Regions:
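A short glycine-rich, Lys/Arg-flanked "PGG" loop and its adjoining helix->strand segment in the class I
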Residues: 203-215
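A conserved beta-strand element that flanks and buttresses the S-adenosyl-L-methionine
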Residues: 189
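Class I SAM-dependent methyltransferase SAM/SAH-binding core
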Residues: 123, 129-177
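Acceptor-substrate binding/catalytic loop of class I
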Residues: 238-255
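Conserved class I S-adenosyl-L-methionine
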Residues: 46-117, 135, 219-242
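N-terminal auxiliary segments of SAM/dcSAM-dependent transferases
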Residues: 2-78
């Protein structure tokens, strides 16, 4: 491992005990001898011996890493879309995008929903192929994307390079055991990710989000509101059970304020109605029947429909 590579990752810390890391060959090692491999420039910082995965089979074990390395496709050229994005589009973007699983004319990269940055360090939790990480970089931030899937992180780096996004960096890591030093980030962002966690795992993630945020920094997390019309229908369809594995968990606004309030002062705002991924920038990619959902959602936002009735809400918490 080159010294230049190590210097790029000065923000990293042991996800188990938060101690500093030092290079040792092709690994990073903490003062308690916990080791983490550096694979082709990507730190692999998961701790699957301490906590079970949030989704079965979603870890970066050595045999999985080797399979990914052996099968990684060549970078696509020009404006073509990496096949990985189409393959995962339903899981990463939701039902409105299901018709794009066979391919799409461009990358569905959204407008970044927080105020434009000026070089602030931002953590994108659950980046997958990097749509929000890329959006953050284009909006003036220095983003680091994390995901527990080595395959996803490799794809994210490949796509960022294709698009000429040089400021994005990626780490294989878990939201509940963030591999960063205390007081590192100006902003912690997550969209469409923590909604798949159990409520106890969200609480664990919130503790670590607060730890890695600088005082006065803030988190911006999208979550589903249990009082939204679409979400009530979906809850009824599964007989109001909590959900398991990668199913969406639905939260009441009071629950969200209580849990995320552990970071600091917390406010909820409307993300959208009748969908958990209302991206108006992607209207040209959607069929008419789904485009109408996003357009209605935008109209309700302009009319200041109550946030308490939105299906998707944003939670902004300032680190106290």
């Amino acid at each position: 491992m080159t010294q230049t590579a190590v210097e790029l990752w000065q923000e990293l810390a042991c996800p188990r005990d938060h101690s500093r890391l030092e290079p040792r060959g092709e690994t990073l090692v903490c003062e308690h001898d916990h080791e983490y491999p550096f694979v082709e420039g990507i730190p692999v910082m998961v701790v699957d011996d301490e906590i079970p995965p949030t989704q079965p089979g979603y870890w970066a074990k050595p045999e999985q890493i080797e399979r990914v390395r052996a099968a990684e496709p060549p970078p696509v050229e020009g404006e073509a879309v990496d096949p990985y994005v189409a393959e995962l589009i339903l899981g990463t973007h939701g039902n409105l995008y299901k018709d794009l699983s066979g391919g799409m004319p461009r990358y569905p990269i959204p407008d970044f929903p927080v105020p434009r940055g000026n070089g602030e360090l931002l953590l994108d939790i659950g980046c997958n192929w990097g749509r929000w990480t890329i959006a953050a970089a284009r909006s003036g931030y220095r983003p680091i994307g994390i995901d527990p899937s080595f395959e996803a992180v490799v794809a994210a780096r490949r796509i960022a390079r294709q698009l000429g996004v040089d400021d994005a960096r990626y780490v294989v890591a878990d939201a509940r055991k963030l591999p960063f030093a205390d007081d590192t980030f100006d902003v912690v962002f997550s969209y469409g990710v923590l909604q798949h966690f159990s409520k106890s795992d969200v609480a664990l993630s919130v503790v670590d989000i607060r730890r890695v945020l600088k005082r006065g920094g803030y988190s911006w997390v999208q979550m589903p509101n249990a009082l939204g019309a679409l979400n009530l229908v979906r809850l009824g369809q599964r007989r109001f059970r909590e959900g398991d594995e990668f199913e969406v968990r639905y939260w009441k606004p009071s629950e969200l304020k209580r849990v995320f309030g552990r970071i600091g002062p917390t406010e909820l705002s409307t993300d959208g109605f009748f969908t958990l991924n209302p991206q108006k920038r992607d209207l040209d990619l959607l069929p008419a029947r789904f485009r109408a959902i996003v357009q209605v959602s935008e109209a309700l936002k302009r009319a200041h429909a109550p946030t308490t009735l939105a299906d998707s809400v944003n939670i902004r918490s300032v680190a106290a």
